Every structure is written in structure tokens, then in C-alpha cells.
């Protein structure tokens, strides 16, 4: 399945990369690589993570305290957020494809 990332998620992800790069050069790049690997895994195995009661699925990153929240809609994977696991739980829950 093809994965699309909502504009809001892309902007937040860019902020996270910049924040990690400011902490240590190269750290933001490692975050980007880990998220890319997670999205590729999701594209191959989208239905493996169970759907949560609110209709989304989530894959935790292995190194960074982030997760990729997504939903499958109309045959496409929509990444709703690349969210920090300990900050603002489900702040992105109202996001939907086409609502950008």
C-alpha cells in the first residue's frame, strides 16, 4: 500500500528533526531514518498493528520516543502524526485525509 503523510504531520516532523539536530549534529538525521524505516514497514504490513478504538493504528519507533500514527482509508495509508510518546496524547486524533 502507498503511504501519504498529512501536511501537519510533515511540519511537526520537520520541527522534531531540527530540534534533535540542535541537540547533536546527526541526531535529527537518525530520527528521519528511523521514521522512514517505520513508514516503509507500515507500507508493507499496514494491517498488522491492531486498530485502536478511535480507528487509528500506531507503530512505535525503536530508538526515539516517538510513534507513527496512521489510518487506512480508501486503500491508502494516511500518516496522521509522528508524535512524541510522552507529550500531548492523541492531540492529532481529529486529523483526517483531505482536511489539511
Feature names for model-found ranges:
Residues 29, 67, 71-100:
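Enriched for short, Lys/Arg-rich terminal
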Residues 22-24, 45-54, 87-92:
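Short, charge-rich, low-complexity interaction segments located
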Residues 32, 36-39:
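Short, well-structured alpha-helical segments
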Residues 37, 44-77:
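Basic/aromatic recognition patch in beta-strand/loop cores that engages polyanionic ligands
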Residues 1-32:
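Arg/Lys-rich, positively charged N-terminal/basic patches that mediate binding to nucleic acids
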